[in-house]
Amino acid sequence: MNTGAAHNMFFKTVEDSIEMRDRQKDGYSTEPLLPSTPTQRTFDYVLVAHKVDDETDQRAQRQRAFIQELEKKNISVTKLIHDDKVFFGLRAPHEAFEDYMYLLKVSDSCNWCGDARGGVTQATRIRIVHFILHETFINTGENLKELLMKDVFETMFCLHEKKKQKQLQKKWARWSALFTGQPVNDVKCYFGEKVALYYLWLGWYTKLLVPAAALGVVVFLYGLAFFNTNPLIKEVCQSSIIMCPRCDKTCGVWQLSDTCVYAKVSHLFDNEGTVAFAMFMAIWATLFLELWKRHRAKHVSQWKVYDWCEEEEELILKIVNDPNCKPKQFRHSYLQSTLVLILVTLMLMLIIGLAHALVVFRVVAAPLMSEVSWDFIKDHANTVAVMLGAVLHYVTIQIMTRVNRWVSLKLCDIEKTNSFAATERSFTVKMFTFQFFTLFSSLFYVAFFLGRINGHPGNYVRIAGWRLEECHPSGCLTDLFIQMAVIMLLKQTLNNIFEFTVPWLKSCLRRNTAKKLQRKCGHCYRKTCRDEQGRVEPCDICKLRDWLRNYHLADTDAFSLFNEFLEMVVQFSFTTIFVAAFPLAPLLALINNIFEIRLDAIKMARLERRLVPRKTNDIGVWTKVLEAIGVLAVIANGLVIGVSSDFVPRLVYRYRYGPCANGSTHADCMQGYINDTLSTASMSHQAVSHDFNRKQMMITDTGVNATQCSYRDYRSDEDYTLTSQFWLVLAVRFAFVILFEHVVVVCKFVAAWFVPNNPIRVKNDRLYDKLARLKEELREMKRDMSTDV
């Protein structure tokens, strides 16, 4: 018999085999393990503090005071010292969990949950102890949060359960499981319902992105199919029209045919298929949310948390912590609400001001790019300026994300909500609002204002002497596409790289710090780690080994899961709001999410400390946020198609001004469209000659001195007033927007009505469950009455 087979004879539990494999991997002793009986003495939480030798130091006194307060609540404290760190292992008394179970049973909203019927899991123990720790105050009135801020304690964390952690790593948190299903029930048991619902929602969102991504690719291929044969592209590429200079100082006239490539790219995203796709995505967003509600209802019903109330559980935890506690009453102050409203408004004005700064950057960058010696950049100065603006926008987003978080937390402190759940809802709404304005203010400018407020030759609009940007003759939609593509690609790619590499590098660097201790521990484990009853009771070295393993993982906090939700909801916004300008957005989101699920799983199960398991029955206020995004998507896409794209002007030209409008059947209906959208500026006009006063500005590449040039607008060639065609196009634009939004909104309401939130099976299961529960209560009452008699 080989050595490995002999060793396996001693493995009575999966935990033993896991431990032996880890010891062999780390170079520990491979001597056989003794059969083990799992210990019942688990640690619920660990506090870490810096070692203070001076007993009179304020930090040492506060540490002792806090530990004494915990001991008064019958929490067992195990103190271990390692180098300059002091570890406090905390274990709550069984009575606290019995009180919790009883209060759940008599609760109005929580009495139907699974915890009220079964035993207390380790996840529940952690949640209870976490609450007790944060609600424990020392004689100075400070709680744990304030002690952590004052460096009395360095950190706090709950411990990973090694056996369950390894099982999750094997089934879920690995790259080889990229295209397999998620063990949501196992995630729920280990990380709690809140984390499980995040992965359930993310998996559902990713699954429903498949049809959206497929249709987006079809729309893109539709534009690609007519890439070279479209008459509008031919008109641009074969044109000899001379266009007016794009800027004041360094730009000269140019030929429309110079932008042939730009016109082709514009047609990829600005075509007839875009309208149908935008309508589909608006209805898709509604169906996604309605089907998600059904999917959620099925799982929370199985988990027995359908009627769970977080605020009520918080009241129960308050009583468990202090039977004489008083509830934190609901309060409303008009002064506080007004102050918060003013501060939010000021913050939004600051964010919009940053968007204006980005506009100024592009206005200044475009003429500067036209001065460089590199011909490629010089010829595509406007496009390069847009791309640089998008990169700068991304940098602004990264900076403002931290500012927005700090401001949102401070505003929540001003509001003084009565529960953590209420604080979380308030923080979510504020943070998302700030992030939304940070991300989309610049995009809204590009979509709805770029090229519409810049004026015309002889009367240009300027900022500090710099002319505002103009739209390309083929339309402004490509600028919006470039802006979205750069931000979305940078945000998703770089964020995922940093999300994974930073915790991984920290874990690798810290892993060697406890190597000596772990090797020493490898020789004593399972032999000396036994109590008098023969149960496995880790020695101090084994405890330190486990605590250090968790201590060296990346830190987590109450808003760690919020960050993941925010990232995905922002992506959902990009996927739906301006999808008319970027049909490939759902495809990029789908590819990103396939990796995002495993990336987040690997982070949580391998690289980060264990999140505090939270019990809930929904994704919370995020549902309302997603519904608001769905409504905004209808409005934004209607405006993008009706106002930003050339769909309506092309439609008007086809049926009112084009060859087909006059009954001609020999020419293409769109022949002459590009020329129809251009107006002419003559140098004989005094105001125009003043704008183009440099001699070099009106000289073409062939050396010809141009006496007139064209620009994109519907204006008279004599007095530059708006033509009747402009007003007709504008009227049709508004009519289209109103019609589009009403049709899509009706479709959304029909879809929401047609798909009920709760499946019939869930309703029936809950009915039978409640009936069985009531019958059980009745039998217990009769049994108690007969016992009394």
Task: Pin down the residues of each PLM region.
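Intrinsically disordered cytosolic tails
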Residues: 2-789
